[in-house]
Design a protein with these regions (language model features):
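ABC-type ATPase nucleotide-binding domains, specifically the catalytic core motifs of the NBD
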Residues: 2, 25-41, 56
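Conserved ABC ATPase signature
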Residues: 65-70, 74
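ABC ATPase "signature
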Residues: 149-150
Length: 172
């Protein structure tokens, strides 16, 4: 069932994709589609996910604010919070911090470390230090092929493949 599969996977792109309308509209989008909850339970779930993403206090609980008025980092966290509303088992991130400043990047990284305790997190990144800080396992790819994979600490401290060693020496 493709609908059930879609509900199990959250996708966060490189550039935040906020929907037209308010923060609340964005947060209720998937929740209204995939979950049958009372109005009170929907509101509680929205607040919980915004808090988890570290955004609720920053917007002072103003969910009627336009989503497009948020900063880039806030929009990225809104997208993460929106995905969390349906409790996905897997979250896929494509360069989640590439367009963010260091403060917002560190906030997103902290959130990803928290999320990976309960969900499977897959991150595509060219940022080696970010991979080292977040990932439990790393897959190093070149030209669409797996060069090496294993525990992140092992890959970064004792890479087995020459291409991995060369890449880490250049950028790691």
């Amino acid at each position: 069932d493709s609908q059930m599969l879609r509900r199990q996977i959250g996708l966060i792109g490189q550039q935040p994709t906020v929907f037209p309308g308010t923060i609340e509209d964005n947060m209720l989008f998937a929740l209204n589609y995939y979950k049958e909850l009372s109005s009170a339970d929907r509101k509680a779930k929205v607040i919980q996910c915004l808090e988890q993403a570290g955004l609720y206090s920053e917007i002072n609980g103003d969910m009627k604010r336009l989503a497009s008025s948020l900063s880039g980092g806030q929009q990225q966290r809104l997208c993460i919070a929106r995905s969390l509303t349906v409790d996905p088992r897997v979250m896929l991130f494509d360069e989640p911090c590439s367009a963010l400043d260091i403060k917002n990047s560190l906030h997103i990284e902290a959130l990803l470390r928290e999320l990976k305790v309960k969900q499977t997190i897959v991150i595509v990144t060219h940022n080696l230090q970010q991979a080292k800080r977040i990932a439990d396992y790393t897959v190093f790819m070149n030209d669409g092929r797996v060069v090496e994979w294993g525990a992140t600490e092992q890959i970064f401290s004792h890479p087995q493949q020459e291409l991995t060693r060369d890449y880490l020496a250049f950028g790691g």
